[in-house]
Amino acid sequence: MKKQIFSTLVLSMCLLLPFSLYSQEQRKKVGVVLSGGGAKGMAHIKALKVIEEAGIPIDYIAGTSMGAIVGGLYAIGYTPEQLDSMVRKQNWTFLLSDRIKRSAMSLTDRERSEKFIVSIPFTKSPKDAASSGGIIKGQNLANLFSDLTMGYHDSINFDKLPIPFACVAANVVNGEQIIFHNGILSTAMRASMAIPGVFTPVRQDSMVLVDGGIVNNYPADVVKAMGADVIIGVDVQNALKKADKLNSAPDILGQIVDITCQSNHEKNVDLTDTYIRVNVDGYSSASFTPAAIDTLMRRGEEAAKAQWNSLLALKKKIGIAEDYTPKQHGPYSSLSNARTVYVTDISFSGVEVDDKKWLMKKCNLKENSDITTQQIEQALYQLRGSQSYSSASYTLKETPEGYHLNFLLQEKYERRINLGIRFDSEEIASLLVNAT
């Protein structure tokens, strides 16, 4: 009798299983869109956490600028907790500069860097101009992106990521929107946040790519085109200021930026099923202080929780039960967490082959040896500290024998005007000007 009951239960489960699987396959696909907004985009992290807590599956994610960075990292498996920890431990003043660590600089260069407050690039030829276009090259930020995306340094199809991903940049050659669905992930993220005039653009083929916010700062249409039936959006853009609030040059400039970023905004909001608008009053794209980051994250969580009932109601529209639990997302296990990799060969792009011996000595690295991520980082600072290269980045690609480490170098063509102020008891103050 027991055997008969057991057989009946097994048969029932087998009959029900296909219906359960069919139901899951037939559910509507969910897309998340994350707007641009610089530092204000820190709010995205905690908003994603709340979406997860609501039991909403995320099938696609798209973003612009900081939304592209958070979205790209989330797409490869970073959890909101990992992202929270990562952003809090960064030295944002250093990251948002092209400063080189003192330990990698010669004594002369150390003394020079301490004298001058501002360093402004200028060029003398079209060849020089190709490496310019902004006050900050974003070297330290780009290297952070490379560290964070280890394991994804090849040119890949972003649809093949754990969560399909896309991000938006703008081609200033013709004003067109460029949607990254493939390529090198860290490069796509860097292009999407290249604020015009602040960060140098990313040059790819015949395109000159800058922050996607000027063409589509809230790309709900992009995530819909990817296949999303239901869209959840997190928007960290500032509301336009009234006339009585526009009292200074920074106010006017900020308003112009915000107006530019409004392109297609209302149309994309209309595509959104649950719209999470974060209160970012009092904060700007440059609010990277620890206190600001803490507040922005908290506001992101509060804004998402304010839409809690809407999120739960979405489950019915998606076609899942109230107690549905999506597949666990992450955590991302980066090579940078392992800290040591076996490197079989090292190459240098953008330089003469004959330079390799000198470069290997400068980097203090050896082929066919274990190399830490700290050693790679130090090698980058040594290369930039030599003052021979305007930029230095790297890729680390897995091979059957180990890893291939390639340094991408750009020879230094541009010159810079360095400005500083010197105080002493006799001259009181004097302006320091220097060209390098």
Task: Give short role names for the model-derived ranges.
Residues 42, 399-400, 422-430:
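Solvent-exposed loop/turn segments connecting transmembrane beta-strands
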Residues 363, 395, 415-423, 431-436:
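Transmembrane beta-strand segments that form the barrel wall of outer-membrane beta-barrel proteins
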Residues 401-411, 431-436:
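N-terminal periplasmic accessory domains that precede
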Residues 21-64, 72-381, 385-392, 396-397, ...:
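Patatin-like phospholipase
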Residues 1-27:
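Bacterial Sec-dependent N-terminal signal peptides
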